[in-house]
Amino acid sequence: MKIKTRFAPSPTGYLHVGGARTALYSWLFSRHLGGEFVLRIEDTDLERSTQEAIDAIMDGMNWLNLDWDEGPYFQTKRFDRYNAVIDQMLDAGTAYRCYCSKERLEALREAQMANGEKPRYDGHCRDSQCTHGADEPSVVRFRNPQEGSVIFDDKIRGPIEFSNQELDDLIIRRTDGSPTYNFCVVIDDWDMEITHVIRGEDHINNTPRQINILKALGAPVPEYAHVSMILGDDGKKLSKRHGAVGVMQYRDDGYLPEALLNYLVRLGWSHGDQEIFSIEEMTQLFTLDAVSKSASAFNTEKLQWLNHHYINSLPPEQVAVHLSWHVEQLGIDTRNGPELVEIVKLLGERCKTLKEMAESCRYFYEEFDAFDVDAAKKHLRPIARQPLEAVKVKLAAITEWTTENVHNAIQGTADELGVGMGKVGMPLRVAVTGVGQSPGMDVTVHAIGQARTLARIDKALAFISEREAQQ
């Protein structure tokens, strides 16, 4: 049997982390077993579905590199197929027209609730012999079995059973002729030959209804696996406050797709005590029986830790491709400065996100208007004039601009003045970067370049003189 899974988001908002995890699990399951992965856009909610949301879903999937073998399919383009099946069901007697008014249904609901009963359709039109006009508005309901139960073996949760008496006759076509969500899903899974449905636990109650429709159609029933929800670190339902933002927001905030994928796969799935997984390892190791039934808590600090790991473990060239987007967003012109690959090597250990890295690398490419106040107050004092002037002479004398020669110039200055490296390095750091923290001065000065370094030392010396004159 060819394994076939699907990811079927509704385009009513962004692709959030819960949806991304579901997509990842479905993708990994199919890839692990050499199957196929289908992308389906469930856009039957015409009022809430937007092209912007569709674009956000596609962007998120592409950024995460979760490729699909079929699709994207759109339910709104399959209405003729759904309605053809509904008409066949009407002819076969597995569906019927319901003419109950909204007023009758509301009164029924209120009466049931007043009696402490679960609100459900009472089957008034199920076996009715009364006639109605051809143009009289009606919905179409599925004739759900009234006896027995629906039992399915959830691949994450184990056997789940629903009594058919608890299931009312589901509306499968509205009065306006449009098919409903639960019905469209069934026909899609049937037509697309989906073998395994992996989705959120909020769909568990839909499953027995969908199974009954499939059985009424004589269609194969796929396997089902329902993943638990993601909670905030305070145990409450995930919200924007915890990190329930669109996947592309994580891109904007400077996270690598490899880090987010690694984080998402561990939100409910485990393999021993291993924390770091490449996408190849995930694909090789992923199984549904290792997915937890318990809810998972979102932890931003853990995601940042993983992101820092991948910034420093992936090939710098690969990280630089992602960094370039952030640098462009800040309007930094990198043509007159080091390659971004060098920035990744220089700043990787110091940065948890690429956004932080992009913001920190400005001084390699742009002149700064002012020195950091605290750093200048501490290190650009009159006592710093001598080491800055001395190191400038040695840096200016370098004919081959290498990291080693830069280091020797700084070290030689400290040796000649009989002071520690910090007495030279810290004023030099503030002079050439404008801030009090940076990578080692030899690699930083080398990356900034000789001419720019000498000009900035002159700027710092002028700053010291101005400051001295004001005192």
Curated annotation (Swiss-Prot):
It is found in: Cytoplasm. A motif ('KMSKS' region) lies at residues 237-241. Keywords: Aminoacyl-tRNA synthetase, ATP-binding, Cytoplasm, Ligase, Metal-binding, Nucleotide-binding, Protein biosynthesis, Zinc. Catalyzes the attachment of glutamate to tRNA(Glu) in a two-step reaction: glutamate is first activated by ATP to form Glu-AMP and then transferred to the acceptor end of tRNA(Glu). Zn(2+) binds at C98, C100, C125, D127. A motif ('HIGH' region) lies at residues 9-19. Its main location: cytoplasm. Its cofactor is Zn(2+). This is Glutamate--tRNA ligase. It comes from the Bacteria. GO terms for molecular function: ATP binding; glutamate-tRNA ligase activity; tRNA binding; zinc ion binding. GO terms for biological process: glutamyl-tRNA aminoacylation. Monomer. It comes from Yersinia pseudotuberculosis serotype IB (strain PB1/+). ATP binds at K240.
